[in-house]
């Protein structure tokens, strides 16, 4: 069962990326290091609802 998720920057809170994940394989919240255009650097992005 794949669901669409939004990834938000942990430093500025801006929602920069949209992705999908398999809830059966990854039930916990996804965390990835991605580029934040507002901060102009790579920051930790966390899955939001």
Curated annotation (Swiss-Prot):
GO terms for molecular function: structural constituent of ribosome. GO terms for cellular component: cytoplasm; ribonucleoprotein complex; ribosome. InterPro entries: Ribosomal_bL33, Ribosomal_bL33_CS, Ribosomal_bL33_sf, Ribosomal_zn-bd. Keywords: Ribonucleoprotein, Ribosomal protein. One of its GO terms (biological process) is translation. Pfam families: Ribosomal_L33. Belongs to the bacterial ribosomal protein bL33 family. PANTHER family: 50S RIBOSOMAL PROTEIN L33, CHLOROPLASTIC, LARGE RIBOSOMAL SUBUNIT PROTEIN BL33C. This is Large ribosomal subunit protein bL33B. It comes from Geobacillus thermodenitrificans (strain NG80-2).
